[in-house]
């Protein structure tokens, strides 16, 4: 039986050639390709500065540690509970307290729920572009300006996504992207921070590499605390090659999503999120929201899909439900996040899927739901 992952890398001969060139060059790290990758990201996203990292998690930590001077009197940061846990974990690692906001039915933070969470301790808002759909940028920008907050974006899902015909990446003070193997473009593991703030860029650049400023070939100076979060040349070469194909890879995902939309239209079991999009999305995920009557048998539905070779996933368990967060904060459940978690399933959507496979998956999904016969 053929299996279909919810996402997987799309690699070709050019990608392999780019990697082999680095291996043959013997310059495996701290070479020109990481710089070229950063330059290409700036051009692709329309931003001034980009820094590539060995993961989006280390990119988040670097941003959180450097966007502003830390103050114990202003240590709360509002974010979404529907994200991969790194979004909040790195806030904890940086000394901040995450405050979780409600979400909308598209998986993004509810901008109308933010203001009531703001107080004298609030430092910033960290949004997440769920599944590749941009948050309502203007609303968040206005709120941050009104209350003198920093606007940071975890755009790990959203490379190539747009808001009002402009690419995500330049709206917040800084934005983080992920190049993990299941993202629209990949470096196996990897990430980036982009910003138009030159001072912040320099701080993060030092933090990424031991806080060290090289004066010349044999001598340097340590200016601040730092880590080794660099992306090596092998990964940078792969990223550079993948980025050239980003529009094509996005188009393939869009074609798959549109095929799902057509087959799923007006079905009685679930609502796909893709038809609700107003702006271009990376389509990192293809989420569906099951109708409430299916909530109690979600695990059985997922098991049935997997038996059919459809390796669906769930994105995400609310972060505050994890044991660590319950022990630290004992956060009360947020109904919007709870409902989303109970309803959401991510179906296979990636550039390796041909349309015949997408059609077969879609019809198998409908048959799976039909087999449960819940009134």
UniProtKB/Swiss-Prot annotation:
- Any one GO BP annotation for this protein: polysaccharide biosynthetic process
What enzyme class is recorded for this protein?
transferase
Pfam families tied to this protein: DegT_DnrJ_EryC1
Protein name (database record): UDP-4-amino-4,6-dideoxy-N-acetyl-beta-L-altrosamine transaminase
* Result for mutant: residue 183 to R: Strongly impaired catalytic activity
Q: Which family does it belong to?
A: Belongs to the DegT/DnrJ/EryC1 family.
Which residue positions does N6-(pyridoxal phosphate)lysine occur at? 183
Q: What are the UniProt keywords, alphabetically?
A: Aminotransferase, Pyridoxal phosphate, Transferase
Classify the source by domain of life: Bacteria
Q: For this protein, what is any one GO molecular function term?
A: transaminase activity
Catalytic activity line of the entry: UDP-4-amino-4,6-dideoxy-N-acetyl-beta-L-altrosamine + 2-oxoglutarate = UDP-2-acetamido-2,6-dideoxy-beta-L-arabino-hex-4-ulose + L-glutamate
Q: Where does substrate bind?
A: 6, 26-29, 56, 178, 228, 313-316
Q: Cite the NCBIfam families for this sequence.
A: PseC (TIGR03588)
User: What does this protein's UniProt record list under function?
Assistant: Catalyzes the second step in the biosynthesis of pseudaminic acid, a sialic-acid-like sugar that is used to modify flagellin. Uses UDP-2-acetamido-2,6-dideoxy-beta-L-arabino-4-hexulose as substrate producing UDP-4-amino-4,6-dideoxy-beta-L-AltNAc.
List the EC numbers from the record.
2.6.1.92
